[in-house]
Amino acid sequence: MFFKNDSDRGKNAPERGIVPLLPLRDIIVFPHMVSQLFVGRERSIAALDEAMNRGKEIFLAAQRNAKTNDPTPDDIFGVGSVGAIMQLLRLPDGTVKVLIEGKRRARIRRYVQSDAYFLIEYDEIVESSVASVEVEALMRSVQSTFEMYVKLNKKIQPEVLMAVQAIDEASRLADTIIANLPTIKLTDRQALLEMEEPQKRLERLIELMQAEIEILQVEKKIRSRVKKQMEKTQKEYYLNEQMQAIQKELGGGERDEFKNEIQEIEEALKTKRMSKEAAAKVKKELKKLKMMHPTSAEATVVRNYIDWILELPWYDKSEERYDLVEAERILDEDHYGLKKIKERILEYLAVQALTKKLKGPVLCFVGPPGVGKTSLAKSIARATGRKFVRLSLGGVRDEAEIRGHRRTYIGALPGKLIQSLKKVGTNNPVFLLDEVDKMSTDFRGDPAAALLEVLDPEQNHTFNDHYLDLDYDLSDVMFITTANTLSGIPVPLQDRMEVIQLSGYTEFEKLNIAVKYLVPRQRKECGLEDVSLDFTEGALRTIIHHYTKESGVRSLEREIASVCRKVARRVVSDGKEKPIEVVAKSIPKYLGVPKYRLGRREERDEVGLVNGLAVTNVGGDLLPAEATVVPGKGKLVITGLLEKGMEESGHAAMSYVRSRLDRLGLEADVYQKVDVHIHFPDFVRKDGPSAGVTMVTALVSSLMKVPVRRDLAMTGEITLRGRVMPIGGLKEKLLAAHRGGIATVILPKENRKDLRDVPRRVLKALRLVLVEHVDDVLREALILPDAYAIFGPPKGVLEYRDGELVTEAAPVKAPPAAAGEPTPAAPPGA
């Protein structure tokens, strides 16, 4: 029943009426929308009954909160739609099924009654219906957008799209579309219902549909991806089932083999002794492996990982020997000389025998090539009953070589440490890290940093390899490292090691090594054990002097091997086994022309030529220094492939000489009239300050035009005050002097403590003069009649003859001068 006041409104004036209200939960009925509702609340059923009595019209409005069972006027939106009941059916359970069609928008004016049911008075909302090109374009855009939505949302029937495309009224188009968008939120639907202008309603509708389209497109992609994955999984399952059926027909095949492998792993896990962490890891990986297909790539990775853990020697040890007498016998049997080194090794083994632990410094053998560093490590392994394993670090630049690759990488493996321990089969071998000074660094990491943990006794019991990702105990491993020089080893790594220097062998030691070890070994390797072959001492000396230039004996063995091969050929060709003696004069026939000129002293005393001493990569050597003076303007030139340190030493020598011109009897401005050139022959890089006294002597000899003794060599750093400072490598330098035929060696007094490292045979063959000042060097070296008058008597000079200390330094008669050369005078009072 409608109450209309026609006198108050015109033709298009809004209607007003009083009708029952039906509160709706989670649904909004739009005009032109037919909805089927199930009504169960008593007040709502009463409202329907009243509507049937009032001409079947009812007001439909949504609740603000769907969970409210007994709403009040404040719980109901103020805008809804007036609808007509098309059909009403009472169900057996008391529920009423009703079919209602929305007719027009309306706003609640007031509540007339709210007791048994809601009775309200409403005002109709009159919509503007202005037709324009803009509205027409907007309608087309809405229809096009809805078409896209329908294509993505398969729940909407195609007939709905056809009906929407036939609508030519903006308001009805908007209401029809919103009625068919079930995913739009209730608040957005209510807002569209309250919009009076169709144009704004269409614009908002486009925004909502575009947002829904984006969501539907993402859902479509997800469904497509899931579908493909399911199809792939189903396909794999189907193929696997087929494969299993085929294998079953053929007698089990791969699956049975896979089961056998798992059983073997389970049995090995029961018997293998390993850490609790490792056992738990194997069980976890085995559980994963059982769920995998045998031929999958992941199964192969897991199997390899389990194999590595099971094959490592977690608690497998070699039986160790602590017999020092036997250890000393083995060291003496394998190596000649090296007395100090052997004593240190025996001390190391004695401490281990008492403590039964390896905690202590790691030994680092430093020395030139071929002196026996690697073979010493092998002898230690033999003496202690441990197995021996060697890892060369030369050229290693990747941290993963030490720590391994993580399992995420294809083809990942443990580091070389773990690989070597698996190969050797015990967890207490003698582990030689060879050429530790030859490692380098790049973008993949610093292997030297990775070794810090390995060589630290406080940390290596929990060494963690990246591949295993487990703690492995390295504390029982006896690590030994080798290097040619300390310069290539980082300081933190040096701090974890005890450095043992292995100097070069003397000529006497090389002779004995050749006779006792090298010649017998090469005779055996060349099949000459039954042939009477003898190397004379002269032949071996010739090979040492003219065919090798090294501190060790590696090249010496190669040359002996070359002689033995030529002898073997001669024996096979002649078919006779006559005694063969290799003598000095026959060596060029076997080895060709001499390769090296022995670093020996000159045959004449010459001006500006001084024998210096140096340490090279192959041991000690004579380092002759030449100085010459030419007319010029005081320029100093130093040549000979020198490093910066040696050039600075040359400038210091020149400054000292200039400060002593008056004492030397030279004009004060003589250096301004001449250029001085100091040269060090031989194309070998030279560095260090130990040639300071050599350059001072060469400069003074050239400026004074006084010759230097040819049978004398010297070494020492100088200061601007003329003090002679200590140097390094004394043993190697004295070996070189002895080898080069030098009779007297001048060296810093502060190096007296280092003489204990020099072989007794060498000390007895040399006269040693230990000085503190350059004046003592010049007095001893220059062949000068009035040397004592110029440089004064010796002060604090020590002299060794035949290896014994002489209380006072006595003058030594210089070697006979060549024809036409001055003869040195005896000192005053002699």
Swiss-Prot record:
Q: Which residues form the Lon proteolytic domain?
A: 604-784
Start-end of Low complexity biased regions? 811-823
Q: Name one GO biological process term.
A: protein quality control for misfolded or incompletely synthesized proteins
**UniProt binding sites for ATP:** G367, P368, P369, G370, V371, G372, K373, T374
| Catalysed reaction, written as an equation | Hydrolysis of proteins in presence of ATP
Induction pattern: By heat shock.
Keyword Protease (UniProt) = yes
**SMART domains from the UniProt entry:** AAA (SM00382), LON (SM00464)
Q: Name one GO molecular function term.
A: serine-type endopeptidase activity
Question: GO CC annotations?
Answer: cytoplasm
Q: What is its EC number?
A: 3.4.21.53
Please report the stretch or stretches of sequence annotated as the Lon N-terminal domain. 19-213
Query: What keywords appear on the UniProt entry?
Result: ATP-binding, Cytoplasm, Hydrolase, Nucleotide-binding, Protease, Serine protease, Stress response
Q: State its location(s).
A: Cytoplasm
Q: Would the keyword Nucleus be found if you checked this record's keyword annotation?
A: no
Top-level EC class: hydrolase
The record's region (Disordered) falls at 811-830
Give the quaternary structure.
Homohexamer. Organized in a ring with a central cavity.
Q: Per its UniProt record, what PANTHER family does this chain match?
A: ATP DEPENDENT LON PROTEASE FAMILY MEMBER
Function, as annotated: ATP-dependent serine protease that mediates the selective degradation of mutant and abnormal proteins as well as certain short-lived regulatory proteins. Required for cellular homeostasis and for survival from DNA damage and developmental changes induced by stress. Degrades polypeptides processively to yield small peptide fragments that are 5 to 10 amino acids long. Binds to DNA in a double-stranded, site-specific manner.
Q: Which family does it belong to?
A: Belongs to the peptidase S16 family.
Name of this protein: Lon protease 3
